[in-house]
Regions:
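C-terminal capping alpha-helices of c-type cytochrome domains
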Residues: 129-169, 242-270
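Post-signal peptide N-terminal segment of mature Sec-exported envelope proteins
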Residues: 28-54
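Bacterial N-terminal signal peptides that target proteins for export
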Residues: 1-11
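Amphipathic alpha-helical transducer elements in NTP-driven molecular machines
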Residues: 101-109, 247-250
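Periplasmic/extracellular electron-transfer cofactor-ligation site
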Residues: 47, 53-102, 113-129, 155-168, ...
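Bacterial signal peptide processing site
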Residues: 21-24
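Predominantly soluble domains enriched in secretory-pathway, periplasmic, or organellar proteins
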Residues: 173-181, 201, 225-226, 230, ...
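Bacterial N-terminal signal peptides
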Residues: 10-18
């Protein structure tokens, strides 16, 4: 493994990327024009101000920056430009400054034409990233426009001054850009596949911001294209820079986002049952495992762009079976016995795989949503009945409902809508999506998180056709989470609320709302014992370069219970998953959605005995993104996915297996098609993380 070298983090300094941002390959290298002699600051004249305003609008600068006096310039990706000129002198004198400018004019010019020469330390309270702003910005500005922008930033209008010109906050619907039928159909499909998970099917926002026309029209095609191409430091992928989309495709998406979102159809029970297939009936399945392999150490691996999962032998690293599943599988959950793997695709197709067969085989499937993220099974076995392997539940993004199914055949039994009212403003929400679901050991209950309205539902499945539901008030934008080490308390991130909600599954009540850094994204989290604070549960973040650890021991360490007791800094934000094991001395974390490609493929480990900073970080690959960790059943190995590009032979993806004790690489499982999540049978059944 290569040693990690310090990677400068921060944000772009200057303006948003202009029209040339996504055409880097088409334009010659930018050279910095000589800075003119600095003139005394004076009020911006109307013609110069109008020219600057036109330049800001031309480039969609307000998509990334707050710019005083510029209508709708309220972006938060880049730094606030309100006082950039006033702070230039102090910055240039700082030892951290890496540029060459000696005057304010030269500083602003450098920031526009050579944005990575110096990366500012702060972007609206978050660490910012190198490489977000393209140097090809200068190609889109004439010398007159550049001079006007510099003059404007040196003397922007005050709070009480009128803006130079006005425009409506949102353009009328009939002013939205046009799309051909072919373009509209393509953009609609791509939005569902790549964007709806964070921004919502109706584009009302969740993990990502709302993309309704009242928001997007103000940014315009160029501003939207800038963000789509470059991504953001808060977790949005850089679709253009990665090569997922061409400039022409990005332009189509930007125009699509300024139109009203198309209304998706509902999915009634009749249509669900029409999609239901049982390929091997329960009485035709084996009574005992037919394989000599250690099936409890199988890994079920998502092959995202192949529409498959690979079942890999954790002892031999062999691919035992590739099984067709739904599109872009989000998660796999095991039945309570571990025999069956329930695989949910983002297209709402649920596949059931029998791991006892000599070759793991799909035995049933059904589609209960058009967009989904979660599946869980019934696990309770106690005084109120034995529900082992009897039921399953799928949580849908669209339509907003969950569906209870027969756990042996996947026959749909009952549908429950999640439409309702938000916990904070009590406003009706038409699209409250179902996020994570976990199964309680204390009751025949599922804990179902209803994202947009901020409610946690305790769903009693003892009577699956008439489930009893207790609604707990938490915080909006609930997403993913997991159990504490005792499996009594469930912790779930309300990511855009910057909180973690805590539920006591034994008593069926809310315990706490814990404030965290920006946009917590724990996956299932990581349970470990902090040397100072005792048992904790930890999460990474999309919006901040940090790990938060929350005390989880109200009996042994009551002073620290349900408080954020430690924040461990990371080299970058964009973390999706964190993982540990009771037998390990390490905590592993990724930065998958960081806009810096080096950080996106970098993984870090934190020593439990010294959790104040990363023990070491390294690049796991020379391409793609490092994502998601999973231990083998013994807790001696860690598997990490290299999420590649299905269109690039040799770089489609692989899994890297590390020795957990020494952090040394053991083996690579190559030539997998965009592997992402991995689910070890034993660890998934027993909720070990």
């Amino acid at each position: 493994m290569r040693p990690w070298k310090h990677i400068v983090t921060g944000a772009m300094l200057g303006l948003a990327v202009l029209i040339g941002c996504a055409r880097q390959a088409e334009t010659p290298p930018t050279t910095t024009a000589p800075a003119p002699q600095e003139a005394p600051v004076s009020a911006t004249t109307a013609p110069a101000g109008d020219l600057a305003l036109a330049a800001f609008k031309k480039g969609g600068c307000g998509a990334c920056h707050i710019i005083p006096g510029v209508p709708n310039a309220r972006g938060t990706i880049g730094p606030d430009l309100t006082n950039i000129a006033q702070g230039a002198a102090q910055t240039m004198q700082s030892s951290a400054y890496t540029g060459k400018a000696t005057t304010v004019d030269a500083y602003l010019r450098e920031a526009i034409l050579e944005p990575d020469v110096f990366v500012a330390p702060d972007c609206n309270g978050s660490s910012c990233q190198k490489g977000i702003m393209s140097p090809s910005l200068g190609q889109g500005l004439s010398e007159e426009e550049l001079a006007a922008v510099i003059t404007y930033l040196k003397n922007p209008p005050g709070e009480t001054e009128a803006v130079i010109s006005e425009e409506p906050a949102a353009a009328p619907a009939d002013a939205a850009p046009t799309l051909s039928d072919e373009e509209f159909a393509w953009a609609k499909l791509v939005y569902f596949e790549r964007c709806a998970g964070c921004h919502g099917t109706l584009r009302k926002g969740a993990t990502g911001p709302a993309l309704t026309p009242d928001k997007t029209m103000a940014l315009g095609t160029v501003g939207l294209s800038t963000i789509i191409y470059n991504g953001t430091p808060r977790g949005m992928p850089d679709w253009g820079k990665q090569g997922f989309f061409t400039q022409e495709q990005i332009d189509v998406l930007a125009r699509f986002l300024q139109r009203e979102p198309p209304a998706p159809p509902e999915l009634p029970m009749e249509r669900m049952k029409a999609s239901w297939n049982v390929y091997v009936a329960p009485d035709q399945r084996p009574d005992t495992p037919q394989t000599t392999r250690n099936w409890q150490n199988y890994f079920v691996v998502t092959l995202r762009d192949a529409g498959q999962v690979a079942v890999i032998d954790g002892d031999t690293y062999e691919v035992v079976s590739n099984v067709d599943s739904g599109y872009a599988v989000h998660i796999t959950r095991m039945s309570a016995t571990g025999r069956y793997a329930y695989v949910i695709g983002r297209d709402g197709k649920l596949a059931m795989i029998d791991l006892w067969m000599e070759t793991p085989t799909k035995v049933a499937e059904v589609q209960v949503c058009y967009d989904a993220r979660s599946v869980e099974v019934s696990k309770y076995n106690g005084p109120k009945g034995d529900f082992t392997d009897k039921l399953a539940v799928v949580g849908c993004y669209w339509p907003p409902h969950f569906v209870i199914l027969d756990g042996q055949t996947l026959e749909p039994i009952h549908i429950v809508s999640t439409r309702g009212y938000t916990v904070d403003t009590m406003e009706y929400h038409p699209e409250p999506r179902v996020a994570s679901i976990v199964a309680s050991d204390f009751q025949p209950e599922w804990i179902i998180n209803v994202k947009e309205i901020g409610q946690i539902w305790l769903v009693n499945y003892a009577d699956p056709k008439a489930p009893q539901i207790k609604m707990l008030q938490a915080a909006r934008f609930l997403h993913d989470g997991g159990w504490d080490a005792t499996h009594r308390y469930f912790l779930v991130a309300a990511n855009q609320s910057n909180k973690v909600a805590v539920v006591d599954a034994q008593e069926g009540r809310m315990v706490a709302l814990v404030h965290t850094p920006k946009i917590p994204h724990p996956g299932r989290g990581a349970n470990w014992v902090d040397p100072e604070f005792g048992p904790v549960w930890s999460s990474g973040h999309l919006g901040d370069p940090a790990i938060v650890s929350i005390g989880t021991d109200p009996e042994g360490h009551p002073d620290y219970a349900w408080k954020a007791v430690r924040v461990t800094p990371l080299p970058g934000a964009g973390s999706l998953f964190i993982k540990t094991h009771p037998n390990s001395k390490w905590i592993w974390i990724d930065m998958t959605l960081n806009s810096d490609p080096v950080l996106a493929r970098t993984i870090c480990v934190i020593a439990k005995e010294n959790p104040t900073e990363p023990h070491t970080c390294w690049e796991a690959s020379t391409y793609g993104r490092a994502v998601h960790f999973e231990y083998n059943a013994a807790g001696t190995e860690v598997w990490v996915s290299i999420w590649g590009d299905a269109s690039k032979p040799g770089e489609t993806g692989e899994i890297v297996v590390y020795d957990d004790a020494t952090l040394t690489e053991k083996v690579r499982i190559p030539n997998l098609v965009t592997p992402t999540g991995k689910f070890n049978v034993y660890n998934t059944v027993h909720d070990i993380y």
